[in-house]
Amino acid sequence: MSFTLAIVGRPNVGKSTLFNRLVGKRLALVDDQPGVTRDLREGAARLADLRFTVIDTAGLEDVTDDSLQGRMRRLTERAVDMADICLFMVDARVGITPTDLVFADILRKRAGHVVLAANKAEGAAADAGVIEAYSLGLGEPIRLSAEHGEGLNDLYTHLMPLADAYAERAAEDAPETDVALDEDSGDMEAALRMPTANKPLQVAVVGRPNAGKSTLVNQILGEDRLLTGPEAGITRDAISLRTDWVGPEGDVIPMRIFDTAGMRKKAKVQEKLEKLSVGDGLRAVKFAEVVVVLLDAAIPFEQQDLRIADLAEREGRAVVVAVNKWDIEENKQAKLNELRESFERLLPQLRGAPLVTVSARTGRGLDRLHKAVLRAYEVWNRRVTTAQLNRWLAGMLEAHPPPAPQGKRIKLRYMTQAKTRPPGFVVMCSHPDKVPDSYNRYLVNGLRLDFDMPGTPIRLWMRGQNDANPYKGRKKAPPSKLRKHTDGRRKD
């Protein structure tokens, strides 16, 4: 997983010019007029062998009102919060301004890593400005000329050790997903890996700040519990907290909880802020095995809640929906029926996922949440034998044969499970491109019902008959060689 670099600084110091040079395209507007970049622009950057995400921000303006400049400033501060590294650019020809001093102080407080760059530093005329940049207290400035491409080697030297550190931490925190299976029955025994101290269950709790997410996490951790952390997470917005979550029957789950700023309340700002808020949730989801989507019982299933739940499904993570503040709900049964109906209607792709009511304030319902998380994790690891699948497929075909589009009969010949975490299945058939979406949904819903896989994402790939054996060349191959099973048409 690559890091994210935010280029920040006051207007017209050359941020967009450097952004365009790193991305290799003119994606950002460049002009001599200050404040041309009014939005956040994100691109895939390349610097020698480094690959990372770069964000071009609006200029940091020393304003506090609700004018356009004020919104640009808040948007930039939001980008600083979500970035792993901030490249703070100053103009070496102009020198350090009072605005630079103010926002250097902001960056010291808000940013995890700050790299200082003095741009427009070509020629002796910039020497005084480069020396003056030391007064910011952010270390030695890099001499850059974004327009001419000078100083990029020095930037690479600064970023390389940080990139290595993020890659190492990402490897430690990344969950094992899309696990390939082969024909050996031994894989069935290994499919469900129980959490251990070295490989704890990774859970992300996501939701709006006023949904009670922090209170719930504190209840799970326990006020007096000695934690092996907090550890810095992959982003400054995410920290992972380790604990042993004791269940109602005394069963203990070694667990790492990814706590993140999550999905913030809709601000009076443009859509980019909302997009960045969901971006925080994305980081938490990517490092989780089970995602707990926390809702407020008073205002459940808002647009942001639906987006993050759908995101977890698309990322292939197990999902548990928890409804908080249940202790102050008066008509509990009617509300529960309403929640279940809304869940089935708004999130059909997660049909059957656990929906648990809790009170983060009192701790009631945590036992149910504990069971639901374990159950979701078990289903996410589910393994079905090839013999069972093909007997099941024969019954499904007999009950509802596939259609014959344009008179072409579709034959579904063979089925096997190719992956787990989440479960993924390959069907060998004729005319895989002709199988309609409705028939794929019929098969996925049948798998979910008949093999007891409620709520978990299920992947289904239709493959042609050119390679009659879906395990060919794969039995002793590394997982990366299994992409041939997922390059075909995917139906969820």
UniProtKB/Swiss-Prot annotation:
GO terms for biological process: ribosome biogenesis. Residues 472-492 have a biased composition (Basic residues). Residues 462-492 are annotated as: Disordered. Residues 3-167, 201-381 form the EngA-type G domain. GTP 1 binds at residues 9-16, 56-60, 119-122. The keyword Cytoplasm does not apply. The keyword Amino-acid biosynthesis does not apply. Keywords: GTP-binding, Nucleotide-binding, Repeat, Ribosome biogenesis. Associates with the 50S ribosomal subunit. PANTHER family: GTPASE DER (PTHR43834:SF6). GTPase that plays an essential role in the late steps of ribosome biogenesis. This is GTPase Der. It comes from Roseobacter denitrificans (strain ATCC 33942 / OCh 114) (Erythrobacter sp. (strain OCh 114)). The lineage of its organism: Bacteria, Pseudomonadati, Pseudomonadota, Alphaproteobacteria, Rhodobacterales.
